[in-house]
Amino acid sequence: SAASDVYKRQALGLYLFINLIFIVKYGLRVSPLVVILGIVLFLTLVLGIFKLYNNRFVDKNIVWLLLIFAVFSYCLTLFVPLESLNVDRWQIITCFCNAVENGEYPYLSHPENIPENLPGPSPFYFVLSYPFYKLNFFEGIPLAASFLWYFCLPFKSRKNRVLTTLLLLISPVYIYEIMVRSTIITNSLIILIWATYFVRFGRWNASTVFFNALLFGMLLNTRNVFIIPVLIYGVYYVCRKQTQMKILWWSFVSIIFFLSLYALLAAVWGVENVLEYNPFRVQSEMIIPAWLSVTIVFIAVVAGAFVKKSENIVFYSCLIFFISAFSTYLWTSFHDESFSYAYLEHFDITYFLFSYTFALYLIKPEICIKVRL
């Protein structure tokens, strides 16, 4: 349909835009020439994939390409020591897990060199990260994304699976995630996997809804921003009478499991600590103001009411993730009184990666044909 083609083109546009702003921001730290070369190389690779993704050799050896990419990327990380990184997500995971093992309240922990940087993610984020912490293998978190993408996401065709996997592997943003041992693409990919299976909600029975709610209650307990696709899905299904009781049952179970880890924190370290230091407070005070969070939530609710087909929910989630990141950038720019300073120095552009993951999934082979023409 015409609307579907618009979604696909916009998804491709977001994919290109987010990669380009990474190239410009980090390339300028070296020289303008690096920016130009980076843009030319990236766009050349994209056009090359548009022509070659359907090649029989590529299709037959895609798993080998994944393995080679993983080994090569891991070798590159050996030249970038953890201690040299300004990105502190691995430090936050380390501090949180160290605090728990030492019997200290984890949301008061912080890196020694950044005392004001308290943990922002929700508890289950650290549960998922714990095996990598114990192995001291933080590279494994972003490296897992390419395998999750290829083996776990549902696609309508193998061509689509191969195309988007290749576009992921050549993305500067994904290589950046691996080099700095970040977690955003992997975390948002897990939510995307859940979201793409959740479109079957209307056909599920009560027990299936229960187990999905249990799973989602834990997944929502990774990052608060993932409330965006939940609200869109929830409002979409509430507007359909045949699923209203299911969505109420699902919501109740999800909330119970979402709150369970906070209840555990309160039982061990006291209600006062949990109320005073928690992810909601950290994110509202250190990242964006509460009024902006409420505005984004409202937009997500309104979007859910306008969705016509469940298949389009991924696009609306992608769009509102982007609006959330861009509005945060604008707020930071006004606070800094400089758009360029906020972009180049202050604002964390990795917030755009939540949108990036959903946008990449929406890119289809037929769009590549039109671009080639």
Show which residues each predicted segment covers.
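Membrane-interface alpha helices of multi-pass inner-membrane proteins
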Residues: Y130, P172, T208-N224, P229-V235, ...
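Aromatic- and kink-enriched transmembrane "portal" helix at the membrane-lumen/periplasm boundary
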Residues: F126-L128, T165-S188
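Transmembrane-helix motifs of polytopic, lipid-linked glycan transferases
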Residues: F138-V162
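Intramembrane catalytic core of multi-pass membrane enzymes that act on lipidic substrates
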Residues: L65-E139
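Short, small-residue-biased leader/transition segments that mark boundaries at the very start
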Residues: S1-Y7
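Perimembrane helix-loop-helix junctions
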Residues: P229-I255
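Short hydrophobic alpha-helices at membrane interfaces in multi-pass membrane enzymes
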Residues: Q10, T165, F198-G217
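Membrane-lumen/periplasm interface segments of specific transmembrane helices
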Residues: I18-I23, K246-T332
